[in-house]
Amino acid sequence: MRPQDERRLLTDHYDALIAENNDPVLDPPSLAAYMERWDGAPFMELLSLDGTQSVLEPGVGTGRLARRVAPRCRHLTGIDLSPATVARARAHLSGYGNTTLLCGDFMTFPFRETFDRVYASLFLFHIRDKAAALARMASLLAPGGRLVLSVNLERAEWLDMNGRRLPLYPDDPDRTASLLRAAGLVLTDTVPVEAALLLAAGKPQDT
């Protein structure tokens, strides 16, 4: 499948989820707790936010994580392919004056700044070229910045939902760590959680 076809399939799927009112921000407490198997309190601790950082979330979705990050940072930028998803995220984050929500392709969007933190959860399994995605994240980090990833441990190669089928590209923790180093980052933390391995990597100050 061509990359542009994959992007269209992904966009259509997430637009359809919004039309079906499938929105993680609106999950009942039991399902919200289930999602934290990937990015709960240990993930937030690795971000190490004190209110002064600029932060980027590729694959921001409807803002499930962004709503936890925004009160803890100076400014949050989120980007997603799906127009309907971004519109929902804007609604959920409308109470915060320090957020920018963008609709576009993280890999090619012309960001005008670098960020003190970049983080992603349940995102990389949608991307075939992991090396390019991680290099892109590293390039968007300011010197001294930190990248935090939730590396999904599930190995499914397809997502079947509501009559739609999406290809997935499973993550591999060891390869992800190697690719972070290849992108010029220094791996600082590896934290196992229930459904993922959390990785944190820093960008050297002299980069």
PLM features per residue range, with description:
Residues 131-143:
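A short glycine-rich, Lys/Arg-flanked "PGG" loop and its adjoining helix->strand segment in the class I
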Residues 1-50, 148-170:
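Conserved class I S-adenosyl-L-methionine
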Residues 122-123:
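Short catalytic micro-motifs in class I SAM-dependent methyltransferases
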Residues 168-184:
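Short alpha-helix
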Residues 62-108:
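Class I SAM-dependent methyltransferase SAM/SAH-binding core
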Residues 58:
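Conserved beta-strand/loop positions that form the S-adenosyl-L-methionine
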Residues 119:
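A conserved beta-strand element that flanks and buttresses the S-adenosyl-L-methionine
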